[in-house]
Amino acid sequence: MIGAVLAGGRGKRFGGDKLLYRINGKPLILYTIERLETAKKIDEIILVASKDNAEKLEKLGYRVVVDNLLIGPMGGVYTALSLGDAFVVAGDMPLLVPEFVDFIISEFKKSGKTACVPRWENGYLEPLHAAYSSAFREVLEEKIKAGNYALNRAIREVNPCYLPIESLPEEWRESFFNVNTREDLGKLHKG
């Protein structure tokens, strides 16, 4: 399965390009990529980026696919699925847990559903830490044509496989940690 790392976003809250911000000499996005590489069920890693970011990200040595839609996460997922089924993760999730990725992919394949998404007890979804079938792209295309860019709404409409987060190993939850501000980097150093 493809491991698609979304490298969109403008880093407004962070105050710059957070994905290339260096932590201990290494760009933030590389922490996510390196953890994803150790997931056993990932065959290939691609980066989904805007045209503006593509050249900078190509220097990391991974295949970069350009998201020309620029409509947020839905556009990134849509672009990734043009290459086949994919596990999609945001590039700012440096504590990604490879065993959790493998678990999601296994459950996705067992379920036969279009999407397999972790869900919190309160109903909140983790759509940028989920597995999708390339068939989900057709659903997204309809939404995009209609101007509806809410990824969670599209997911809910396809009767996905939900993974109840509270019933999974607690240590896997660090996988959802994402960096939005420079203060978050402090949490990363402590963790």
From Swiss-Prot:
Q: Name one GO biological process term.
A: Mo-molybdopterin cofactor biosynthetic process
Q: What is one Pfam family matched by this protein?
A: NTP_transf_3
Binding site residues for GTP:
6-8, 18, 67, 92
Keyword Transcription regulation assigned: no
Q: Where does Mg(2+) bind?
A: 92
| Main subcellular localisation | cytoplasm
**Keyword tags:** Cytoplasm, GTP-binding, Magnesium, Metal-binding, Molybdenum cofactor biosynthesis, Nucleotide-binding, Transferase
Q: Where in the cell is it found?
A: Cytoplasm
* Reaction it catalyzes: Mo-molybdopterin + GTP + H(+) = Mo-molybdopterin guanine dinucleotide + diphosphate
> Does the record bear GTP-binding in its keywords?
yes
Superkingdom of source:
Archaea
EC assignment: the record states: 2.7.7.77
Q: What class of enzyme is it?
A: transferase
Annotated GO MF terms: GTP binding; metal ion binding; molybdenum cofactor guanylyltransferase activity
Annotated Gene Ontology cellular component terms? cytoplasm
- What cofactor does this one take? Mg(2+)
Give a short account of what the protein does: Transfers a GMP moiety from GTP to Mo-molybdopterin (Mo-MPT) cofactor (Moco or molybdenum cofactor) to form Mo-molybdopterin guanine dinucleotide (Mo-MGD) cofactor.
Entry comment, domain topic: The N-terminal domain determines nucleotide recognition and specific binding, while the C-terminal domain determines the specific binding to the target protein.
The similarity annotation says:
Belongs to the MobA family.
Q: What NCBIfam families does the record tag this protein with?
A: PRK00317.1-3
Designated name of the protein: Probable molybdenum cofactor guanylyltransferase
